[in-house]
Amino acid sequence: VYSIIRYTRFKMILIVDSGSTKTDWCFADSSDVYVLVHTDGINPVVQSYDEMLSVVQKQMLPRAKQQSLDLASLDEVYFYGAGCTPELRLAVEKALRVAVDEKPSVYVDSDLLAAARALCGTDSGIACILGTGSNSCYYDGEGIKEHTPALGYILGDEGSGAVLGRNFINGILKGTLSRELRDVFFDEYHTSQADIINKVYHSAMPNRFLASLSKFILPHIDDESLEALVVRNFENFIISNIRNYSEAKPVINAVGSVAFLYRKQLEQAAMLQGYELGKILKSPLEGLLDYHFANK
């Protein structure tokens, strides 16, 4: 008597969460079995095809090999990234194809859709990104239905780390934050007004410098004037962005380091503006794993 044993092969997928500074490559065959590989960022807005290809070939592939990952076994690739507008997605897909060949299906979408899928799954809701920059949308369970343009840290990006840093520097230099806080800041950072102005107006990426000031803000959040500034930054985000989503339930879901670290202040701002706080994630990867394996 012979028995037939059928082996069920798990679907192998690659989920990529990419920003301008770093990229997380998550190789998974289930939502709780995965391997992470980290590389520099991939952003088609600021990088050429050759630069993106270099990250794939010189960083991702060798590090995947070190982890004994077999890219030939991949069934699907989901790349979510900053700057992945419809007109720029083809260049990203082309760079990925060099690594994974023609077998797997490759999908390239925006970081905002990643946030929406991670936070809301197949339900409708408000999805936000609150990190160095900010973004938001109303998601109907399948796609982005409404979107308020973020506009960057000069014209917009309310609620972001960059705008928080900008408002903090404004308060320190103009004296609207407490004198005690000002003294502690200059003592810890060994800087001056002239140095700060130079970094903001003459450095290559001032938004990153401004966002980095969160390292000072968070440990000193007990200062009343500083906490009020953080809450006000989130309120401005809600007023300028979230109120536009007339169909959405008054529940704010957010992903990103600023949302995660300042959850208490975000919840306070939401309450002041008539909203509740929903799901908060530091990174979208956990939610994306659940989303893609629940919908396989």
Where are these regions (language model features)?
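Anionic group-transfer/hydrolysis microenvironments
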Residues: G19, C26, A82, L113, ...
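Short, conserved beta-strand segments within well-ordered enzyme catalytic domains
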Residues: C26, Y78-Y80, Y107, A127
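Proline-centered loop/turn at the N-terminus of a beta-strand
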Residues: E76, S105-Y107, V251
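Glycine-rich beta-strand-to-loop/alpha-helix junction loops that act as flexible
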Residues: Y78-T85, L130-G133, P250-A259
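A short glycine/serine-rich beta->alpha loop
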Residues: P44-V45, G83, A150-D157, Y275-K279
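Phosphate-binding/catalytic loop of phosphoryl-transfer enzymes
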Residues: T85-E180
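ATP-binding/phosphotransfer module of carbohydrate and carboxylate kinases, centering on a glycine-rich
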Residues: Y2-L74, V98, L119-C120, S124-I126, ...
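Metal-dependent C-N hydrolase catalytic cores
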Residues: L71-A72, F79-G83, L90
